Amino acid sequence: MKILIPGGSGYIGRQLSASLVNDGHEVVILTRGQRRAFPPPLAGEGQGGGLRDVTWDARTASGDWVDELAGAQGIINLAGANVGSGRWTRRRMAQILSSRLAATSAIVQAIETTPADRRPSVLLNASGIDYYGNRGDDIITEDGEPGDSFLARMSQQWETAAMKAEPLGLRVVRMRTSMVFGRGAPAFNLLTLPVRLFVGGPLGSGRQWFTWIHVDDIIGLYRFGLENERLSGAVNAVAPDIRRQVEVAKEIGLVLHRPTWFPAPALLLRLLLGTQSQLLLEGRRAVADKAEAAGYRFQFGGLRQALEEILRRR
């Protein structure tokens, strides 16, 4: 199977590409830089798979990358500026949004120029569980109403851009992803750092619901979506064991043998982070109904199980 991964040089893209290549698939990373997304040994020989980088500008449907679409079976679109990098000034928020919309629009335009009988059959497009905004104690399935925060509006517009591939004959999966837990995962490293430094604890009230997913399961869901036509539309990429933030901090502390009694008041976080504080203070009790109904089985469904695998692994 030949798979294109725009934005595949980030954390999830690297893990996903390695998994696909090791199982014999051909992976083409679309990257804006000239440097390889992986050191050569990571590409591996697998069972006949391969890994290539192809340059694109992530804005226009032109260049050699467009030719790669013909004969590919799927596209996994991860392209977009890092949400967690840099303070959210107006300029930065505009960049976060425009980078996603421009890249996705370019992909859809390129699909349209590809002969219908040579087009990929599926587009798996990243999105965020923040789509739903701050929802308190409501249990949220994929049919939940969208929120009105910056991240919610961004996710809505991103998904709308991706859905334009449906009239072109592609099955579109919108992967509403929660915080990815994994060894070396940037957001997870930031989450656990205060606990490691003995200053972990509740963020704001700590009662906001905290959704998460182990890196092996976000990879598993993307691969499941590639291969299973039963999965389409919005998918909540969240582990079944949903906790309040204060409970997550406590579990991290138990695994790391650290106290978690040091609170970070909401007012302080808003003063320090501005709009970006919504990443820490807003919560949603989202459940993975659609993925589980389609037959996906989580490898790391429990919070303690996931934390021990990541934090105690040598």
Located regions from the model:
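N-terminal Rossmann NAD(P)H-binding glycine-rich loop of SDR-like oxidoreductase domains
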Residues: I3-D23
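Mid/C-terminal beta-alpha module of Rossmann-like enzyme folds, strongest
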Residues: G225-T275, E308-R314
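C-terminal amphipathic/interface module of NAD(P)-dependent oxidoreductases
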Residues: Q278-R314
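NAD(P)H-binding glycine-rich loop region in Rossmannoid oxidoreductase-like domains
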Residues: R52-A103
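Glycine/proline-rich active-site loop of Rossmann-fold NAD(P)-dependent oxidoreductases
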Residues: Q156, V180-L190, G225-V235
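A conserved pocket-lining segment of Rossmann-fold NAD(P)-dependent short-chain dehydrogenase/reductase
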Residues: L190-D217, L221-F224
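Conserved beta-loop-beta element that borders a ligand/cofactor-binding pocket
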Residues: S127-G128, T160-R183
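Conserved Rossmann-fold NAD(P)-dependent oxidoreductase catalytic core, especially the SDR/UDP-sugar
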Residues: M93, S105-S149
